[in-house]
UniProtKB/Swiss-Prot annotation:
Coiled coil: none annotated. GO terms for cellular component: cytoplasm. Belongs to the endoribonuclease YbeY family. It comes from the Bacteria. One of its GO terms (molecular function) is metalloendopeptidase activity. GO terms for biological process: rRNA processing. InterPro entries: MetalPrtase_cat_dom_sf_prd, YbeY. It is found in: Cytoplasm. Its EC number is 3.1.-.-. This is Endoribonuclease YbeY. Transmembrane segments: none annotated. Zn(2+) binds at H119, H123, D129. Single strand-specific metallo-endoribonuclease involved in late-stage 70S ribosome quality control and in maturation of the 3' terminus of the 16S rRNA.
Length: 158
C-alpha cells in the first residue's frame, strides 16, 4: 500500500470539554509516524458519557460508563484499499471523572484524554489489555508514547 495523506475524520459530539480538532490530527499523525504505521483513514469520535454508554451496551452488551471504545477495522499490513485503521469513540468526561479527586488543571485533563486516544490507537494496532500482563505492557507503551508526544507538543488541546 502506498502512503497517501492520511484522512483523519474527527467528530466532536460532546460539549463538556472543548477539543481543538487540529490538535487531534497532530496527535494522530505524530503517533502513526512514530510507530511507522501505514493507513489511509482513521475515525475519531468524542462523545458524551450517555452516548458512549449506549454504544458500549450495543457493542459489548454492557451499559456501564467507559472512557473509550475501539473498533479496529483493517489490521496493520492488510492490503485493503482504502486501508481504514479503525474507529475510536472517546468520552472526555471520563477524564474529569478519573481526575476528580486530584484537583486537575487543564493540562492534566487534556493529557488524560490524549491517553485515551493513544490507548484506542494501540488497540487498533493489535495491543490488548485483557490480562494483567497485557495491561502492564500497554500502560508502559502508552507512557512512552505520551512522553514522545509531550516532547513534540502533540498532546490534545482546547
Amino acid at each position: 500500500m502506498t502512503q497517501e495523506k492520511i484522512k483523519i475524520h474527527v467528530s466532536n459530539e460532546q460539549t463538556c470539554i472543548p477539543i481543538h480538532l487540529v490538535s487531534v490530527e497532530k496527535l494522530v499523525l505524530t503517533l502513526l509516524e512514530h510507530l511507522k504505521v501505514t493507513t489511509n483513514e482513521i475515525f475519531i469520535y468524542f462523545l458524551e458519557d450517555k452516548a458512549l454508554a449506549e454504544l458500549h451496551d450495543k457493542v459489548f452488551a454492557d451499559p456501564s460508563l467507559t472512557d473509550t471504545i475501539t473498533l479496529p477495522i483493517d489490521a496493520p499490513g492488510d492490503p485493503a484499499y482504502p486501508h481504514v485503521l479503525g474507529e475510536a469513540f472517546i468520552s472526555p468526561q471520563a477524564a474529569l471523572r478519573f481526575l476528580e479527586n486530584t484537583s486537575p488543571n487543564q493540562e492534566d485533563i487534556y493529557e488524560e484524554i490524549s491517553r485515551y486516544l493513544v490507548h484506542s490507537i494501540l488497540h487498533m494496532l493489535g495491543y490488548d489489555d485483557t490480562s494483567s500482563e497485557e495491561k502492564r505492557k500497554m500502560r508502559v507503551k502508552e507512557n512512552q508514547i505520551l512522553c514522545m508526544l509531550r516532547k513534540k507538543h502533540a498532546l490534545l488541546t482546547a
